């Protein structure tokens, strides 16, 4: 593979920032001030929002001399950079000022803008960098602080997941991520120039690590998801733009090769007043890249027209010259233009597939008004050869450092291989250059990723056009989509039909049971070593529930219970009994290995609610493995456990049984999602008494970090150490300890946010909602969930989301009807007919003679303890008109007038979601307790202190972790 002309290893576009070795501090174990964050700033506590809401110039003329051009270029480039930097600083100051006055339900945390890559990494046990990492950094001349910070970021990712593939590629992606984290703002408008430019071109670093561009971008995109910081959306958008820009440049470069061979003749060796073909090709392509960087859009058509405009300008000036570069012109091409009396733009559009009218319009109204600094304004090589060659190069290299982009001069072949452009321009492979490293090593997964990308693009072309063109969406226009057949990674085949799928599930169940017997089992052994063996309690529960399961199943099938019970039902009962005992064994053994106190563990095991939940899980496992058509919550009703309490053990069971198949895990994930979206909000749910004691408004915002430590319910936290009967309030009602309640609610709230974010992101994309409208929609949902939680009682999560989408569309003056939004909702995989046809309301609200308005000041406790009112169901449009609209009258005005910085950005829900992650004791993973954050006095604390000085006492609750 020939060497590329651009950016060889060890060549930096700027001088190093220091003279000493950049690895001395790393090897010595010291830390730089730029990468240390001793204590994160205090997080605010959410308040009720109602308490806060009371009141280019074109450069003309030719170059006269070398010094004039140099001074002009440096001055204009410097002034442009300074002005843009000042604008970014002003945006930062406005962001900081707005935080003091923004509504808590709408804004972000009251912390400053931290360096994203430094704010969440535990640096106490970071091992020293590997030798290969240091060698790559040394070859790229990276500053010491970047070497240290990038290695800490890489080590943080290694501790979280197992990184497969080239270690050097992941280390390079960590460097790229760290450099972007220094330059990308978390808030405010999306920037085109980084706050802190790169010290070295990223292509130089990639060549130093011998990694291809395609592999670097692929690994960086995945690295962003692994870290999953608060700025993940900004990172993904930035990398997406870089990838799209490269894709456009690939197409344009291949077209440019054909055009260059058509207009110019090959001159292998240049002279003082006439460059070689390789030099002319390099200057033209670099000039195009400089102008391309100033385009507000980066689509293929606009770049195509930009290329035509540049060639038109160059050709026009060359024709006016008698010596020098004019010798490059292809005489046959010139004669054809003169013979047909045709302009070069018309000729290029005719021969290479462009629109003459669009190209002329772009040239007259866009290109001629663009700033021309950074590209040659004369092509007199005899007088200004060095400047013509260096000015575009310098301008483009400054752009690369300011934006962190890939050097697209990588496509230019070396001098030795340049003759291939003239020999076979159509067969010159551009995309392959991105797949090969500096030494010629090919990216193994490049072809596979290309196929996936092509299929994704074709799907977007097939479906995306309808959303933009069709304003009215009707059910008759929807085309049924054939679902893809899922390849079974565990069995190595495709499921032929439902029967074979059920058979594979049953085989997996048989594998879980194996030859397990109670006699001489670990369960019997461990229980025997306890001071008060729980074996009798477990066996009694097993016998009681299996009998109930058998009776219920037989009664539904119309059979009588006698000695002639079918053998099949008997086998199912035995399977259920064994599965229950196996899971109890795994739970007890695993918890004892964690050094859990025996007293705490016995309290959990003897709790009826816990045993019923575990048995309910086993019933679901038996039903799905044997192909029984008993949709959830049939198993919960059988076991007498509420779905909200049952979903708390799902993570526990999946974590302790590693032999569950993918289909089994997906089945329980769907059940958990059903509980979160509907069953938890029923009026009889245990969730409501917990919310009364610890409202959602007391919890801090999660941002976009779905992967913090509180993702799973702990078995020990399932019950307090003291029995519930021992803790009662003044009215005799049982009190759930605050630490347990807050932990349970925090995990549930996080999962609710994740589910809502995923549904809302899909729905808002389908209705073509803009970025500001999405933030408004998420801000409204967040306010309702935290400050008006009662609106969710007896309702489906999607019902609230649909209403939020409709009202935001209305305040943004959209003409889309509610029925059209419902049509888009029906396209979601998790849609339900009952969502928009059966919304619970009170019967008194529908009284035609005297309809009762909704009481927006009613509390959850008043609803629970008050007299039960008659309920009925209506369609979602009627519900919106009689209740939802009245509940949001106040907040919607604040959201409508709020600035973009005051609105909450919709978080990104990763594909893996909150799926339980199995972590075993054999894993090389160190879990350390972080020191407690020292919070400063918040606004709420200061307000309460002022009230207490006036003689008013207010009790403030904090949510526990």
From Swiss-Prot:
Q: Which Gene3D superfamilies match?
A: 1.10.472.140, Cyclin-like
Q: Which GO terms describe its biological process?
A: cell differentiation; embryo development ending in birth or egg hatching; embryonic digestive tract morphogenesis; gonad development; negative regulation of cell cycle G1/S phase transition; negative regulation of DNA endoreduplication; negative regulation of G1/S transition of mitotic cell cycle; negative regulation of mitotic cell cycle
Matching entries from PANTHER family are given as:
RE32990P-RELATED (PTHR13742:SF17), RETINOBLASTOMA-ASSOCIATED PROTEIN RB -RELATED (PTHR13742)
| Annotated positions of the Phosphoserine modification | 714
Q: Where is this region: Disordered?
A: 1-43, 55-129
Which residue intervals are annotated with compositional bias (Polar residues) in the record?
68-81
Report the family membership: Belongs to the retinoblastoma protein (RB) family.
Report what the protein is called. Retinoblastoma-like protein homolog lin-35
Q: What does this protein do, in the record's words?
A: Key regulator of cell division which acts as a transcriptional repressor and negatively regulates cell cycle progression in its active unphosphorylated form, but allows cell cycle progression when phosphorylated. When unphosphorylated and in its active form, interacts with E2F transcription factors such as efl-1 to repress their transcriptional activity and negatively regulate the progression through the G1 phase of the cell cycle during postembryonic development. May furthermore act with cell cycle regulator cki-1 to negatively regulate cell cycle progression.
- Location in the cell: Nucleus
Q: Which organism is it from?
A: Caenorhabditis elegans
Tagged with keyword Transcription regulation: yes
* CC annotations in GO: chromatin; DRM complex; nucleus; Rb-E2F complex; transcription regulator complex
- SUPFAM superfamilies the UniProt entry points to: Cyclin-like
Source taxonomy lineage?
Eukaryota, Metazoa, Ecdysozoa, Nematoda, Chromadorea
Record note on disruption phenotype? Viable, but with a reduced fertility and brood size. Low penetrance defects including reduced integrity of the proximal gonad, a low percentage of endomitotic oocytes, distal tip cell migration defects and abnormalities in vulval morphology. Some studies demonstrate aberrant intestinal nuclear divisions, with increased intestinal nuclei in growing larvae. In addition there is increased sensitivity to RNA-induced gene silencing by RNAi. RNAi-mediated knockdown results in increased survival in response to ER stress inducer tunicamycin as compared to wild-type animals.
Q: Which UniProt keywords apply?
A: Cell cycle, DNA-binding, Nucleus, Phosphoprotein, Repressor, Transcription, Transcription regulation
């Amino acid at each position: 593979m020939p060497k590329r002309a651009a950016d060889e290893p060890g060549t930096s576009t700027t001088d190093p920032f220091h003279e000493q070795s950049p690895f001395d501090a790393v090897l010595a174990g010291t830390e730089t001030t730029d990468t240390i964050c001793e204590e994160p700033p205090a997080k605010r506590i959410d308040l009720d929002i109602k308490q806060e809401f009371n009141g280019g110039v074109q450069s003309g003329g030719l170059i006269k001399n070398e010094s004039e051009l140099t001074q002009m270029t440096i001055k204009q480039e410097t002034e442009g950079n300074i002005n843009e930097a000042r604008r970014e600083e002003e945006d930062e100051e406005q962001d900081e000022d707005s935080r003091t006055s923004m509504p808590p339900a709408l804004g972000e945390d009251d912390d400053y803008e931290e360096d994203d890559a430094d704010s969440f990494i535990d640096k106490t046990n970071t091992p020293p960098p590997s030798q290969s990492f240091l060698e790559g950094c040394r070859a790229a001349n990276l500053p010491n602080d970047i070497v240290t910070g990038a290695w800490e970021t890489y080590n943080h990712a290694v501790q979280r997941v197992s990184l497969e593939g080239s270690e050097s590629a992941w280390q390079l992606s960590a460097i790229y991520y760290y450099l972007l984290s220094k330059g990308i703002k978390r808030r405010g408008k999306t920037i085109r120039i980084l706050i802190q430019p790169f010290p070295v071109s990223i292509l130089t670093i990639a060549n130093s690590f011998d990694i291809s561009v395609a592999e670097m971008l692929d690994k960086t995109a995945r690295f962003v998801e692994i870290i999953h910081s608060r700025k993940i959306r900004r990172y993904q958008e930035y990398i997406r733009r870089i990838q799209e820009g490269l894709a456009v440049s690939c197409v344009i470069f291949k077209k440019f090769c054909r055009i260059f061979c058509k207009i110019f003749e090959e001159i292998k060796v240049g002279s003082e007043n006439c460059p070689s073909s390789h030099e002319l090709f390099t200057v033209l392509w670099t000039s195009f890249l400089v102008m391309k960087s100033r385009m507000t859009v980066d689509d293929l058509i606009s770049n195509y027209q930009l290329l035509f405009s540049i060639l038109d300008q160059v050709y026009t000036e060359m024709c006016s010259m008698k010596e020098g570069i004019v010798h490059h012109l292809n005489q046959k091409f010139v004669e054809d233009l003169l013979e047909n009396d045709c302009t070069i733009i018309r000729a290029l559009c005719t021969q290479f597939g462009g629109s003459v009218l669009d190209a002329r319009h772009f040239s007259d109204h866009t290109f001629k008004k663009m700033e021309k600094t950074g590209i040659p304004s004369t092509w007199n090589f005899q007088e200004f050869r060095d400047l013509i060659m260096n000015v575009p190069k310098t301008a483009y290299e400054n752009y690369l450092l300011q934006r962190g982009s890939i050097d697209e001069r990588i496509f230019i072949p070396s001098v030795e291989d340049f003759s291939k452009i003239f020999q076979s321009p159509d067969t010159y492979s551009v995309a392959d250059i991105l797949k090969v490293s500096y030494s010629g090593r090919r990216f193994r997964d490049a072809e596979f990723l290309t196929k996936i990308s092509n299929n994704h693009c074709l799907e977007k072309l097939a479906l995306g056009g309808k959303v933009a063109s069709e304003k009215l969406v009707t059910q008759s226009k929807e085309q049924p989509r054939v679902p893809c057949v899922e390849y079974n990674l565990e069995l190595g085949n495709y499921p032929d039909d439902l029967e074979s799928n059920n058979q594979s599930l049953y085989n997996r169940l048989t594998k879980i049971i194996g030859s397990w017997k109670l006699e001489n089992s670990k369960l019997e052994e461990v229980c025997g070593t306890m001071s008060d063996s729980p074996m009798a309690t477990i066996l009694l529960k097993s016998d009681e529930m299996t009998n109930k399961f058998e009776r219920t199943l037989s009664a539904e099938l119309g059979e009588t219970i006698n000695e002639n019970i079918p053998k099949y039902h008997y086998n199912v009962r035995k399977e259920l009994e064994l599965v229950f005992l196996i899971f109890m064994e795994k739970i007890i053994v695993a918890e004892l290995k964690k050094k859990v106190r025996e007293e705490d563990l016995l309290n959990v095991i003897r709790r009826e609610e816990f045993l019923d939940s575990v048995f309910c899980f086993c019933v679901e496992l038996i039903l799905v493995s044997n192909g029984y058509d008993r949709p959830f919550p049939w198993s919960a009703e059988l076991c007498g456990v509420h779905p909200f309490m049952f979903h708390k053990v799902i993570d526990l069971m999946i974590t302790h049984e590693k032999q569950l198949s993918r289909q089994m895990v997906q089945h329980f994930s769907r059940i958990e999602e059903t509980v979160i979206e509907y069953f938890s909000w029923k009026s009889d749910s245990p969730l409501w008494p917990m919310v009364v004691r610890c409202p959602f408004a007391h919890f801090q915002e999660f941002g976009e970090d779905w992967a913090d430590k509180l993702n799973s319910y702990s078995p020990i936290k399932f019950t307090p150490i003291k029995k519930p009967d021992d803790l009662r309030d003044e009215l005799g009602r049982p009190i759930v300890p605050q630490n347990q309640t807050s932990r349970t609610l925090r995990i549930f709230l996080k999962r609710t946010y994740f589910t809502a974010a995923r549904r809302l992101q899909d729905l808002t994309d389908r209705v073509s909602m803009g970025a500001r409208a999405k933030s408004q929609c998420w801000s409204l949902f967040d306010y309702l969930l935290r400050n008006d939680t009662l609106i969710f009682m007896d309702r489906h999560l999607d019902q609230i989301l649909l209403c939020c989408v409709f009202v935001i569309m209305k305040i943004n003056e959209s003409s889309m009807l509610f029925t059209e939004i419902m049509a888009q909702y029906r396209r979601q995989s998790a849609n339900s007919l009952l969502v928009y046809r059966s919304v619970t309301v009170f019967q008194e609200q529908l009284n035609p003679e005297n309809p009762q308005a909704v009481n927006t000041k009613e509390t959850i406790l008043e609803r629970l303890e008050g007299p039960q009112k008659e309920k009925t169901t209506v369609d979602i449009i009627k519900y919106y008109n009689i209740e939802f609209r009245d509940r949001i009258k106040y907040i919607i005005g604040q959201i409508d007038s709020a600035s973009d910085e005051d609105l909450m950005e919709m978080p990104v829900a990763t594909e893996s979601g909150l799926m339980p992650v199995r972590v075993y004791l054999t894993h090389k993973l160190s879990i350390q307790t972080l020191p407690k954050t020292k919070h400063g006095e918040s606004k709420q604390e200061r307000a309460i202190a002022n009230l207490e000085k006036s003689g008013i006492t207010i009790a403030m609750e904090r949510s526990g972790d």
